[in-house]
Regions:
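N-terminal secretory signal peptides
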Residues: 1-15, 42
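Extracytoplasmic/periplasmic substrate-recognition and gating elements
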Residues: 2, 54-60, 84-87, 165-169, ...
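Long, aromatic- and glycine/proline-rich binding clefts that accommodate carbohydrate-like moieties
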Residues: 38-46, 50-53, 155, 161-164, ...
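Hinge/lid segment of periplasmic solute-binding proteins
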Residues: 46, 123-184, 250, 340-344, ...
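Short, solvent-exposed loop/beta-turn-alpha elements that line the ligand-binding surface or hinge
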Residues: 49-51, 140-153, 197-202, 206-214, ...
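Short, polar/charged alpha-helical segment
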Residues: 64-88, 447
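Extracytoplasmic "Venus flytrap"/periplasmic binding protein-like
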Residues: 79, 83-156, 193, 311, ...
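Glycine-centered hinge/linker elements that transmit conformational signals in sensory
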Residues: 221-230, 257, 261-302
């Protein structure tokens, strides 16, 4: 939905449309940022902000390295626009944890404030931010800026970080940080000849020890790996996965198991959830995921991102399902020679196993209430962000770009230890996002309550928990006009 109080960019800013939408990425720069940008810049171009100093603010995720990189790299952008366009810019960074960031952004945007000029949004928030007209629709911006007309690594990038509604051509975000689930593995354990011999003797199979081994690994055999390395008397467990009620921590691995096993979470076209989420396949996925707690350290039902980092870097687990974006925290100077990052296991019936894991990552979105100057800087910043030099520098600092040129380069796999797994999991059909619906927050809160109730033992019946979630989410979407059917009569009798 366009903002009725904000006409199409170019007219609303009072700047000639051709000037306003002229991209900052048409210089055709090459090389790496290590050599100063200014040595390769063309003569200064006419710009409506020439001679001015603009202060900008980015709102991002607290404690999340990729979020802060935009601001940490902003002096490079300042050099770029100072030499090319003749203006100065400085960036401040406001932040909030994942669980609080949406509310912080929404509270500000609802007042039409330009407190945060550019926001790093979680991907599922696109609908909630776009529908009220709080963020800028980017189709026209992209059309007029060749530097933003990138070839993305896969369709998954567009579907996850850019489009709302799903399946439409409306673009509201641009990828800031790409992210996929990866399995971090203790290379020092799986490459140990004594461990390999013991595993072979116990299970009559090779201990998976290479990227290719894990590429072909199914959940049944992965469970053997977890079991083998679960040695509480030695302070070692087989795995760490996320089970926490905070934000989406339990949801992401559980949805991944459901999808990979052949389950679905809703019908996006009709908004139908009851009868889809609460299926037998998804019930079995719930039961399997809970059963894996025996391979994890005590307290694993409270594990989120930070808790996994702690037990991993302390050497307490042999494997860990974690986001690729957390690579710099997971791989430290002390353990970097002992870690490999690989695709997580496949699920499903023998011979038909597959992996479809939850996407992570965040898009940039632009505040629709920015004044003319800040809107222009935001567009210039986006053009700069997707320059080849910037994307490569971002990767070198630990970020995950999403464009095909950067990710397809010969050097990319070797830049970070997780890059190969990240690319693998970004291939079509291997990862996907879940709802971009404006009711995302309410739906997530309800299911996190239900999922963790079962994982902690408060609720004993997996199918009953799924019925509770499905009925509640069906009501949420029916009340919002998204679902065509109201919850069935059965829903009147469900509870945790």
């Amino acid at each position: 939905m366009s903002n009725p109080n904000k006409p199409d960019l170019g007219h609303s800013l009072g700047i000639p449309r051709r000037t306003l939408l002229k991209g900052a990425a048409s210089a055709g720069l090459s090389g790496v940022i290590g050599a100063p940008f200014i040595n390769r810049l063309k003569a200064m171009e006419a710009h409506p902000l020439a001679g001015k100093k603009i202060d900008m603010n980015i709102l991002g995720i607290a404690g999340w390295l990729p979020s802060s990189l935009g601001v940490k790299m902003s002096p490079l952008f300042d050099d770029y626009v100072k030499q090319r366009y003749g203006y100065d810019v400085s960036f401040g960074f406001a932040e909030a944890p994942f669980s609080d960031l949406f509310q912080k952004a929404a509270t500000s945007l609802a007042t039409k404030s330009q407190e945060y000029n550019i926001i790093i949004s979680d991907s599922q928030w696109l609908g909630a931010l776009a529908k009220p007209g709080w963020i800028l629709k980017l189709n026209d911006i992209i059309t007029k800026n060749k530097g933003l007309q990138l070839e993305w690594y896969s369709q998954t990038v567009i579907d996850t970080y850019m489009r709302y509604p799903d399946g439409s051509q409306d673009i509201w975000g641009l990828p800031q940080e790409g992210d996929t689930k990866s399995l971090y593995v203790r290379k020092d354990l799986v490459e140990d000849p004594k461990e390999q011999a013991a595993f072979q003797a116990k299970y009559n199979m090779k201990l998976p020890s290479t990227f290719e081994d894990y590429e072909n690994l199914n959940a049944t055999d992965y469970e053997k790996v977890m079991e083998f390395f679960t040695r509480p008397d030695k302070g070692l467990w087989g795995a760490a996965w996320q089970y926490s009620r905070v934000y989406d921590f339990c949801t992401c691995p559980l949805f991944s198991i459901m999808w990979s096993s052949g389950g679905q979470i809703w019908d996006a076209k009709t908004g139908q959830i009851e009868g889809v989420l609460n299926s037998d396949i998804n019930t079995k996925a719930m039961e399997l995921y809970k059963s894996w707690l025996k391979y994890m350290p005590p307290g694993a039902t409270n594990y989120g991102i930070a808790e996994e980092i702690d037990v991993w870097t302390q050497g307490k687990v042999a494997t860990c399902l974690q986001w690729a974006a957390v690579g710099l925290a997971m791989i430290t100077p002390e353990n970097k020679e002992k870690v490999m990052v690989v695709p997580p296991p496949k699920f499903g019936k023998a011979g038909a196993e597959k992996r479809i894991y939850c996407m992570g990552g965040q898009p940039w979105v632009i505040n629709a209430f920015n004044d003319e100057a800040k809107m222009r800087v935001a567009v210039d910043f986006m053009n700069w962000w997707y320059l080849p030099e910037t994307a490569l520098e971002y990767s070198k600092r630990g970020g995950n770009p999403c464009d095909k040129a950067t990710m397809g380069s010969a050097a990319f796999n070797g830049v970070n230890p997780w890059n190969r797994a990240y690319k693998y999991m970004l291939e079509p059909g291997t990862s996907q996002d879940f709802w971009h619906d404006p009711k995302y927050s309410e739906m997530l809160s309800l299911q996190q309550e239900g999922f963790t109730s079962y994982m902690t033992g408060q609720s004993k019946d997996a199918k009953g928990v799924l019925d509770y979630i499905a009925c509640g989410q069906q009501q949420i979407l029916y009340d919002a006009g998204t679902a065509k059917k109201e919850p069935s009569g059965v829903c009147g009798n469900v509870s945790l």
